[in-house]
Amino acid sequence: MSYDSKPWLKSYDAGVEPEMALPGGSLAERFLQVFRESPGRPAARYMGSTMTFGDLLEMSGRFARGLQEIGLRKGDVVTVQLPNMPQYLVAVVGTLRAGCILSGLSPLLTPDEMSFQLNDCASKALVTLDLLYEAKFARVAGSVPSLRTVLVAGFLETVRGGAAVPDRPALPDKTVEAFMNFVDRHAAEPYEAACASGDTCFLQYTGGTTGTAKGAMLTHGNILANMGQFDQWMKFGHDAETLLTGFPMFHQAGLFIASSALAFGMPQVLIPDPRNVEHIVRELRESGPSFVGNVPSLYLMLLGNEDFRKLDFSGVKYCMSGAAAFPVDKVRLLESVVGAGKMLEVWGMTETSPLITANPARGRKKAGSVGLPLPATRFRIVDLAHGCTEVPVGEEGELICSGAQVMRGYWNRPAETRNALREHDGAVWMHTGDVGRMDEDGYVYVVDRAKDMIIVGGYKVFSSEVEDKFYKHPAVGLCALIGLPNPERPDSEVVKLVVQKSPACREAPDGEVEADLRAFAREKLAPYKAPKIYEFVDAIPLTSVGKVNKKALRGRA
C-alpha cells in the first residue's frame, strides 16, 4: 500500500473533503471582513472584561497607524513578548494591517536569549510586559541596535478603563511608551499596506529544544490554508463556538488558535497563565467553552484539581491536545472526566503553521495516535538513514509532509532550510525530524523525535514508548527518558529515567520507589529499554509551552 494512495481517506469523517480550494489574499483582509460584519460580537474574554470585534477593529487600526507613523514599513518585524491578553490580539491584527511581520517572544527566555532573537530578526518594535521590561529587557536594550520603539503593557491595562501603565524612562536611541498611550494617540485608520498570499506574516521561532532557535517564515497563504483545513476538519459552527486554550500565543499553536477564532468570528477566552489551574477552572465554569486546547502536562495538572473533576462538561465538544505525547492511560482518565470521544490528539510543528494531522472530530479516535493527515496534505514515512525511500505502512521512519501550510523557510538560514525543505517527486517536502508509523487505517503514531531516540547496543529505544509504560505505574506523576554517553561503549548510550513522583507517592522514600520501578521495568520492558539510572526530582523542567524540556535535563546530567 502506497502513501500516495492516501489510505487515511477511508477514515475521514463524512463530509470532510480530501481536497479543498485554498483561499488567497491576506490574513489582515480576512480579519477585517469578520470584524466589520460583527462589530458588537464578543471577540475575547479576559479577567472579567470583554473585548468586541469592533473594539479590536478600532484598536488594531490605531496600533497599525502608530507603527506606520514611527517609520515601520512593509516587511519590518514587530516582536510581541506578552502572555495571552487583549493587547496581544491588538498587536497581531495591527501589525498585519500595517504590512509588517509579527514575531512572538517567550516571556520565559533569559535576557541573552531575548537579545539573540531580537537581533536575529532585526526587530524594529517590541511590545512587552511591564514586569518583563525592568527584569529582563532593560538589561539587554543596548545590545539590540535595530530596535527603536518599546511599548509596555500591563496585566490590568484592559481594553477600556483598566489601570494605566506609567511611561518608562527612555533608553538610549529608543522610545519607550505605555502600550495604551501609543494606541490612543493615533488615528484609527492606517495607510493601505496590501500584502499578498506569499508574503510572510508570522516569524515564529522554534522552541530551541533541539538546537539554536530558528525563525520559521509563515506566509499569509500558509496560515489561511491551515485555517481552512482546520475548519473543514472540525466543521465549526462559528456562531455557536467559544474557544479556551492554555497554549501561549508566542507559540505557533496558541497564535494559530487565537487567529482562527478571529478569522471565523468565534469568541475566545484568554488565559495569561496556563499553570494557574484555579483560574482555568473558573473560566471553564463561567465562560462555557465548546473547545478546549492544552498540552498534556497541563491537562494532567487540571486532572489533579478536584474542582476541575466536578465541572459540568456537557457543553464541551472537544478537548484538543498537541505539542507532546499524551500517555494512553491518561487520555482515558481525562475522557472519564470530560466525556468519552471528546479527546482530540493532533500533531504538527511551527514550520507547518502548525497542523499536519488530527484525529477525526466526530469519528473514530485512536488513543495514542495523532490522527490522520489533514485535507490537501501529502504525507509519507521514509527511511531514517537518508530520508528518501518510503518504508512500508506499519513500519517506523521519518514523517514528512507537503502542503500549502508548509513554511517558506527559516529566516536567514539557507542551509537549514535546504535540510528541512527538500524537493522531490514534484513537491517540496517538510522533513519533520519526528519518527513514527501509520496503521492500515491511515492513523499516524509519533514514536519519538529523531534526536530523542536512544541507541543502546545498536538497538533503537524510543523514549515516548518507554515513558508511556512508566505512566502506568502509580508512583509516576511525570517522567522523561534521556540517553547519556556510555564511556565504555562510545557507540552506545545509557538509558536514564527522570521521575517526578505522583502526589500520592510524594513522601515515599526514593530508594523504595526506585526498587519498585526497576521491578516494574523488568516485567514490562526489554532489557535494553530498561533504565539503568533513575533520578527523582521535585519538578521536571518544562518549556514555555509546557512540554518536558529534555534539553535542560541533558544539560545537567
Feature map (PLM): residue ranges:
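Conserved AMP-binding/adenylate-forming core of the ANL superfamily
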Residues: 22-23, 32, 40-85, 89-93, ...
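ATP-dependent adenylate-forming carboxylate-activation enzymes
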Residues: 82-83, 100-118, 130-137, 266-286, ...
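AMP-binding/adenylate-forming catalytic core of the ANL superfamily
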Residues: 109, 116, 126-131, 403, ...
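Conserved ATP/PPi-binding loop(s) of AMP-dependent carboxylate-activating enzymes
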Residues: 372-376, 387-421, 459-461
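Gly/Ser/Thr-rich phosphate-binding loop
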Residues: 177, 289-294, 303-365, 378
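Conserved AMP-binding/adenylation subdomain of ANL enzymes
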Residues: 224-242, 250-290, 305
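Conserved adenylate-forming
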Residues: 67-72, 186-199, 203-245, 256, ...
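Structural core segment of the AMP-binding/adenylate-forming
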Residues: 69-70, 97-181, 503
